[in-house]
Amino acid sequence: VPLPAHLPKRLEHMTPYIYSKPELQRLFRSAMEYQKNRSKIHPECMKMILQLTYFLGLRLHETMSLRIRDLNQPDLYVHIRESKFYKSRIVTYNHKVGELIDTFLKWREKQGMCCVPESKLFLDKKGLDMHIDTVRGAFERIREHAGISRSDKSPFQPRLHDLRHTFAVHRLTSWYRENQDVQQLLPVLSTYLGHTHLSHTSVYLTMTDGLLGEANNRFESYIKQGKDE
């Protein structure tokens, strides 16, 4: 499936920020360190929210809407129910992510949090549902504590939602590195992300230096093979 010939223009303020791997690690550490005793949110919950949003490429409201019943640990997937465009989907994950979820669930049980199937996965220190704006506010403080900011001219700082964009770009970069046919795999990524049209995936997958580097390496390899033949 070829990429769309003409992609919609993205406004400057909507340009995603793609976190580097070291920045992701700093974010996860900062979630456990910053305002540990003052925040309404358990640091363990905040860290897991960031990790699931990135590792599974979820929208923030999808992460926040997860319930215990949506986790299928034996088969390594989560059920995203009636998300954007009122569509449900299955999002798979690997054993490493499964271990993170297992550890979190055990911690959650030790805290005495409600564990019935209908219970929200993420609860605040009072055992109540967490408000998405509270999470966004906490993320801003975590990001600042981690020392992460934009170096371009954009007036908008990196967002929590950019973790989803980062997942997609890192996935593409891995496919290029593995010499995979990205055009053939893009529909798979589009379905995984819950997009209704392939063009939606193409638009928001910002090309990073790393991704362009992988594409250039592949092109140079192709040219070299042609000369050898």
Give residue spans per PLM region:
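Conserved catalytic core of the tyrosine transesterase superfamily
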Residues: 1-229
